[in-house]
C-alpha cells in the first residue's frame, strides 16, 4: 500500500519546524480550510513545533485563578455570566478580603502550581481607587507569604497609573483578552466598551514591562478566517501567553443554547495558533472539560502547552490532582 502523502499546504508549513518562523497569513488561511485526516496531520506538526520551539521548554505551564469579585459587571459581554445586563444565576459578591485570597493562593502553591491569578469582575480601574489600592496590598501580602508563587492579575481595563503600580508591585503577568478578531468585537462580544480599551491597556502594560496574557474565545459566532485574524492580532500586541477559551453556553446569557463548534475546528484553531506563535505559551482555558471531554488531550497534542486548572470564574473545572496525572501522562508524547 502506498503511503498517503501530506497535504501540500501542510508540507509548506513544515518550514516552521525547521526555522522557527511563523507561517504567513495566506498559508494560515489555507490551513484553516483543512478537513478530515489532514487536521490530524496539522495537529501533529503543531505538536512537533511546540516541542522544538515552544515557550514552556517542553513542560506544561499550569495556572490557577480566583474570582475575587463576582458579578454586577457594567459591561455586556455576550458570553459572560457576570454581566449585570444578563440573567445568569451566579454568586454575587464584592471584593474579598486578603485572608480569602491567601487561602486560595496557599492551596495553589501546595498543589505545585506556579502561577496564581486574582480576577475581578467589572470594566476595570482607570485610576488608583480605594479598591485598587486594596488589591495592591493583597499582591504585596502574597509576595511576603508565598515568595515562590508567581502572582498574576486580571482586573479589566487599566489607566496609566494602575498599570504603573502593578509593575511596581511585582505582578508577573496580566490577563486581558481581545476575545475575537478586533474588527468583530463590537458585534460578537460587547458594545458597552470597545476593543481599543483593551488594546490600549495591553500597550500600557507592555510599556511598563509587564508580560501580557492575552487570548480569546471561540464558538461565539465567528468564522475560521476570523479566528486566524485573531491569532495574528496577538502577534501585533507582543503578548507572552495566549489562553484560548471554548464557549461554554451559560443559561441567562445571550449565547445560551448556542450550537457549539465542531471539534475539528477547535483543533485547527489551536494548531494554527502554534504555527503562528512557535515560541509563545498557548494555554487551554474554559471548555477543556465540558466541550472537549474525551478529546481534551488532543489539544495538548495540537500545539497547546499550558492549561488553567482548578476551576474557572463561574464554571467548574477539574481537580488539580486529576490535572497533575493528566500532565504526567502527556509526557509520553514528548
From Swiss-Prot:
Disulfide bonds: none annotated. It comes from Chlorobium phaeobacteroides (strain DSM 266 / SMG 266 / 2430). [2Fe-2S] cluster binds at residues 152, 213, 283. InterPro entries: Aldolase_TIM, BATS_dom, Biotin_synth/BioAB, Biotin_synthase, Elp3/MiaA/NifB-like_rSAM, rSAM. Its cofactor is [4Fe-4S] cluster; [2Fe-2S] cluster. SMART domains: BATS, Elp3. Pathway: Cofactor biosynthesis; biotin biosynthesis; biotin from 7,8-diaminononanoate: step 2/2. The gene is bioB. Catalyzes the conversion of dethiobiotin (DTB) to biotin by the insertion of a sulfur atom into dethiobiotin via a radical-based mechanism. One of its GO terms (biological process) is biotin biosynthetic process. The keyword S-adenosyl-L-methionine applies. Homodimer. It comes from the Bacteria. This is Biotin synthase. It catalyses: (4R,5S)-dethiobiotin + (sulfur carrier)-SH + 2 reduced [2Fe-2S]-[ferredoxin] + 2 S-adenosyl-L-methionine = (sulfur carrier)-H + biotin + 2 5'-deoxyadenosine + 2 L-methionine + 2 oxidized [2Fe-2S]-[ferredoxin].
Amino acid at each position: 500500500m502506498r503511503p498517503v502523502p501530506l497535504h501540500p499546504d501542510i508540507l509548506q508549513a513544515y518550514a516552521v519546524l525547521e526555522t522557527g518562523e511563523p507561517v504567513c497569513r495566506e498559508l494560515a488561511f489555507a490551513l484553516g480550510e483543512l478537513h478530515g485526516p489532514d487536521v490530524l496531520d496539522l495537529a501533529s506538526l503543531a505538536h512537533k513545533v511546540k516541542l522544538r520551539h515552544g515557550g514552556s521548554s517542553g513542560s506544561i505551564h499550569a495556572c490557577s485563578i480566583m474570582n475575587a469579585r463576582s458579578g454586577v459587571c457594567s459591561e455586556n459581554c455576550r458570553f459572560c455570566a457576570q454581566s449585570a445586563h444578563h440573567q445568569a444565576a451566579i454568586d454575587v459578591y464584592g471584593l474579598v478580603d486578603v485572608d480569602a485570597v491567601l487561602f486560595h493562593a496557599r492551596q495553589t502553591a501546595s498543589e505545585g502550581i506556579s502561577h496564581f491569578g486574582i480576577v475581578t469582575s467589572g470594566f476595570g480601574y482607570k485610576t488608583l481607587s480605594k479598591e485598587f489600592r486594596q488589591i495592591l496590598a493583597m499582591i504585596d501580602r502574597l509576595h511576603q507569604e508565598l515568595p515562590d508563587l508567581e502572582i498574576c492579575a486580571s482586573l479589566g481595563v487599566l489607566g496609566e497609573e494602575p498599570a504603573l503600580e502593578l509593575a511596581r508591585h511585582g505582578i508577573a503577568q496580566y490577563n486581558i483578552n481581545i476575545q475575537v478578531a478586533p474588527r468583530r468585537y463590537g458585534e460578537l462580544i460587547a458594545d458597552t466598551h470597545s476593543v481599543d480599551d483593551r488594546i490600549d491597556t495591553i500597550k500600557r502594560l507592555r510599556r511598563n514591562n509587564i508580560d501580557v496574557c492575552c487570548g480569546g474565545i471561540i464558538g461565539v459566532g465567528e468564522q475560521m478566517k476570523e479566528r486566524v485574524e485573531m491569532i495574528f492580532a496577538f502577534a501585533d500586541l507582543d503578548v507572552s501567553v495566549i489562553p484560548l477559551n471554548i464557549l461554554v453556553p451559560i443559561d441567562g446569557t445571550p449565547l445560551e443554547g448556542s450550537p457549539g463548534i465542531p471539534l475539528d475546528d477547535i483543533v485547527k484553531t489551536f494548531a494554527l495558533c502554534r504555527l503562528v506563535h512557535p515560541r509563545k505559551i498557548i494555554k487551554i482555558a474554559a471548555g477543556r472539560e465540558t466541550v472537549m471531554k474525551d478529546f481534551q488531550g488532543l489539544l495538548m497534542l495540537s500545539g497547546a502547552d499550558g492549561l488553567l486548572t482548578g476551576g474557572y470564574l463561574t464554571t467548574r473545572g477539574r481537580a488539580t490532582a486529576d490535572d497533575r496525572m493528566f500532565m504526567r501522562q502527556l509526557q509520553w508524547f514528548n
